[in-house]
């Protein structure tokens, strides 16, 4: 008896577009980042949210056969965003972009049992960037994540050197590095790297653009 074919879907949304899905993503974030990874984060009623989760923040939920498997958060960099505003000493202020063509990626994660879907979540991230006309994706990452990106063939640019960014619940020092994935100068390479994963991914973009919030792709 053959297994049912795997159906992968990425949904881009704002919390007003999908309130029930957003609660599920916030619960997933609490379980992954606070409970499993031990990050010291603000949680309430089983949910993880912070001041950067606003009505204008955009999200990706990665679903396999209708079940949530991963997510990321995207904030346009002409607005307040995590790495610049919550960690101001991690790099020179001039290093951080502040324009509509840069989108910060944060809360990027998969359940450990679904690490095989990492390529699919990256494919969704670069699809999102293409749809938004992004030139760069700033982020705060640990050194292991940075090395993983390089192994995949993804070029990154640091804004500064690795620095302590806090402690986990066990008191261990956490190190991070601020930087970006420059999109424009490696667009062709990224297209080749993720061509196949993107063909296997059904994408639904439920965000609505109007007025100054519209970004041409």
Question: Regions from the language model: what does each represent?
Answer:
Residues 47-53, 144-147:
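Beta-rich nucleic-acid/ligand-interaction surfaces
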Residues 50-61, 70, 79-82:
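A short helix-loop-beta-strand connector motif used in the catalytic cores of GNAT acetyltransferases and
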Residues 44-51, 161-167:
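Short, solvent-exposed loop/turn elements at beta->coil junctions and helix N-caps
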Residues 2-48, 59-63, 68:
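Short amphipathic alpha-helix that is part of the acyltransferase structural core
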Residues 172-217:
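Long hydrophobic alpha-helical segments typical of transmembrane helices together
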Residues 67-71, 103:
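Glycine-rich phosphate/pyrophosphate-binding loop shared by adenosine-nucleotide-utilizing enzymes
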Residues 82-183:
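Acyl-donor binding region in acyl/amide transferases
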């Amino acid at each position: 008896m053959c297994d049912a074919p795997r159906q992968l879907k990425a949904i881009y949304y704002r919390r007003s577009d999908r309130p029930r899905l957003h609660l599920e993503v916030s619960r997933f974030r609490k379980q992954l980042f606070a409970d499993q990874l031990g990050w010291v984060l603000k949680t309430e009623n089983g949910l993880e949210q912070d001041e950067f989760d606003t009505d204008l923040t955009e999200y990706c939920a990665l679903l396999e056969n209708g079940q949530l498997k991963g997510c990321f958060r995207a904030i346009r960099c002409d607005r307040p965003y995590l790495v610049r505003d919550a960690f101001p000493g991690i790099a020179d202020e001039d290093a951080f972009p502040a324009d509509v063509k840069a989108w910060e990626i944060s809360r990027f994660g998969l359940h450990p049992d679904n690490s095989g879907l990492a390529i699919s979540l990256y494919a969704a991230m670069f699809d999102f960037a293409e749809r938004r006309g992004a030139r760069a994706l700033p982020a705060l990452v640990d050194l292991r994540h940075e090395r993983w990106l390089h192994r995949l063939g993804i070029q990154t640019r640091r804004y500064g050197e690795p620095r302590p960014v806090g402690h986990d619940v066990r008191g261990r020092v956490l190190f991070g590095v601020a930087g970006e994935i420059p999109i424009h100068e490696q667009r062709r390479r990224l297209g080749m790297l993720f061509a196949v994963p993107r063909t296997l991914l059904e994408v639904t973009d439920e965000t609505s653009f109007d007025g100054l919030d519209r970004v041409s792709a």
